[in-house]
Amino acid sequence: MKVRNSLKSLRSRHRDNRLVRRKGRVYVINKTQRRFKARQG
């Protein structure tokens, strides 16, 4: 999982990327291409 300041550019890399908030953190998850996982931090 990558840790990035801004997830906007990471989200646009694949059309299945979803922006999710869990426990006060923002994540990018992708069910089809798992390598696009990222967390904002």
From Swiss-Prot:
UniProt similarity note: Belongs to the bacterial ribosomal protein bL36 family.
Alphabetical list of Pfam families matching this protein: Ribosomal_L36
Keyword Acetylation carried by entry: no
Record keywords, A-Z: Ribonucleoprotein, Ribosomal protein
PANTHER family given in the database record: 50S RIBOSOMAL PROTEIN L36 2, LARGE RIBOSOMAL SUBUNIT PROTEIN BL36B
Record GO biological process: translation
Protein's name according to its UniProt entry: Large ribosomal subunit protein bL36
GO molecular function: structural constituent of ribosome
PROSITE patterns from the UniProt entry: RIBOSOMAL_L36
GO cellular component: ribonucleoprotein complex; ribosome
InterPro entries: Ribosomal_bL36, Ribosomal_bL36_sp, Ribosomal_L36_bact
Key word Ion transport present: no
Protein species of origin: Nitrobacter winogradskyi (strain ATCC 25391 / DSM 10237 / CIP 104748 / NCIMB 11846 / Nb-255)
